[in-house]
Amino acid sequence: MSATKLTRREQRAQAQHFIDTLEGTAFPNSKRIYITGSQPDIRIPMREIQLSPTLIGGGKDNPQYEENEAIPVYDTSGPYGDPDVAINVQQGLAKLRQPWIEARADSEELTDRSSAYTKERLADDGLDELRFTGLLTPKRAKAGKCVTQLHYARQGIVTPEMEFIAIRENMGRERIRGDVLRQQHPGVGFGARLPENITPEFVRDEVAAGRAIIPANINHPESEPMIIGRNFLVKVNANIGNSAVTSSIEEEVEKLVWSTRWGADTVMDLSTGRYIHETREWILRNSPVPIGTVPIYQALEKVNGIAEDLTWEAFRDTLLEQAEQGVDYFTIHAGVLLRYVPMTAKRLTGIVSRGGSIMAKWCLSHHQENFLYEHFREICEICAAYDVSLSLGDGLRPGSIQDANDEAQFAELHTLGELTKIAWEYDVQVMIEGPGHVPMQMIRRNMTEELEHCHEAPFYTLGPLTTDIAPGYDHFTSGIGAAMIGWFGCAMLCYVTPKEHLGLPNKEDVKQGLITYKIAAHAADLAKGHPGAQIRDNAMSKARFEFRWEDQFNLALDPFTARAYHDETLPQESGKVAHFCSMCGPKFCSMKISQEVRDYAAAQTIEVGMADMSENFRAKGGEIYLRKEEA
């Protein structure tokens, strides 16, 4: 925690400096590698961690070493993780998917924007200084065409996006040869179907079945394809966004880059302050990961924050605005029905979802059904035209342990299952949002209810938090629940930062939340038995047992913190090769003692073996050569 709090001006200046000096940067002793698919432009980025050799014998003057294999790991940082790529935030990222989109010939450029609000913003000269300069001309599906990955999958088509994902999900484990690294405990998948090798056809089939989604708006060609589904790696989402009282465009772009560096698979822009439209454009043009939003937040801004004044027309205009900017998935609170609102009256904490409370207030003030529910088919038509995935929001999620798994929560969940089937009629991809605050013994029911009533559509949860007593540490309380529900089958975990319930997270909070959730996701992958998930753990354990400190730091999710903690007590360079750490010291290190025991046992075995052979030699008459029948 910083000792001195920066002023708003200093925070913006710091963010601007970050953007101005931004370069592609690799983690310590790592390098960016690319694995090429069936065509030259399918190049999957990964990070490869270089390891030092193991000392296996010899003397001081003639040491003998054994090489250790480099470890490939999944990398969400896009061009920001490649030192050979020139970064220019003003120009945005390269349009990786544009050739694939154009080759399908099922979309066309629009001659004008569909959103009245977008036209207004573009006509306002006063916004020129804030506006991203390299605006794309948006695309839309041609008449009679559908451009969603679900549509292609149902047609039996394997898209370049699907091939990219298959290679990415295998995490380069085919490069690993050592048996020690490849060993893995069998997992317990609770019905998940995890193939030994993920193929493009498997990706296609999972998407076609609705069990996985590929958030990939045709107007976000900068994004690197990824998949969300329980038969794949558990993913992590990071939330960013400005508010009416804090943050700027510069700071949000900085948070985006920072999020992808620390492992965010997707990022949600939850901006509610000024310049939402302009901020989102900067984020999208510079994002290598899918971007999600909650459109009702911006629609509310358009009616001056008065929920009762919301209209379907204002919301529809917002959907078109965001779809044509390139938003990859919308959170839509269409399951908050008028008849469910009274179910929350006896709750300890009522309705805690912002989107849920907005729609509940609208329903009660008009005594009408939720207009998102009433117009859901029109929402699907818009999403199908741009390939925007739907994240069906849990507006009635529990906001406290006491309210977990109640009538309102599950009534809404069942409605989300009905809406899922409607979205699938339009070939729109769907995932389901989940809680919230749930004690450990009640978590699994959330997963089983979702799988049954939402037809195995991917589940995406906020935690859940397993206790309510730890403000300031809710990344821990929720990380516990996240690991559990990820194991049970949840496809994506929405991170929680230390600032949850307390304030808007800053850059360091974003990192803390992401590291916590990457741990939870990885723990779930291990428990499910995702092929290759244990390779990095094995490499770390081997480095730890062999006192390869530099390799331990570099294999860590956060190499910088691992190194800093070690150096607090053993800062000298000699500490990086010492066969002990400061916890036990040189005489009581369990691993050092284990090595000595192993060496001693090996020596004893050799001695006993030689003695046995000597006795055998004498028993056979002491002859150098024996007749065949005596051997």
Curated annotation (Swiss-Prot):
InterPro entries: ThiC, ThiC-associated_dom, ThiC/Bza_core_dom, ThiC/BzaA/B. It catalyses: 5-amino-1-(5-phospho-beta-D-ribosyl)imidazole + S-adenosyl-L-methionine = 4-amino-2-methyl-5-(phosphooxymethyl)pyrimidine + CO + 5'-deoxyadenosine + formate + L-methionine + 3 H(+). Keywords: 4Fe-4S, Iron, Iron-sulfur, Lyase, Metal-binding, S-adenosyl-L-methionine, Thiamine biosynthesis, Zinc. Its EC number is 4.1.99.17. Substrate binds at N239, M268, Y297, H333, S353, R354, G355, D394, G395, L396, R397, E433, Y460. One of its GO terms (cellular component) is cytosol. [4Fe-4S] cluster binds at C581, C584, C589. It comes from the Bacteria. Pfam families: ThiC-associated, ThiC_Rad_SAM. Its cofactor is [4Fe-4S] cluster. Transmembrane segments: none annotated. Zn(2+) binds at H437, H501. Binds 1 [4Fe-4S] cluster per subunit. The cluster is coordinated with 3 cysteines and an exchangeable S-adenosyl-L-methionine. GO terms for biological process: thiamine biosynthetic process; thiamine diphosphate biosynthetic process. GO terms for molecular function: 4 iron, 4 sulfur cluster binding; carbon-carbon lyase activity; zinc ion binding. Pathway: Cofactor biosynthesis; thiamine diphosphate biosynthesis. HAMAP family: ThiC. NCBIfam families: PRK09284.1 (NF006763), PRK13352.1 (NF009895), thiC (TIGR00190). Homodimer. Catalyzes the synthesis of the hydroxymethylpyrimidine phosphate (HMP-P) moiety of thiamine from aminoimidazole ribotide (AIR) in a radical S-adenosyl-L-methionine (SAM)-dependent reaction. Belongs to the ThiC family. This is Phosphomethylpyrimidine synthase. It comes from Citrobacter koseri (strain ATCC BAA-895 / CDC 4225-83 / SGSC4696). The gene is thiC.
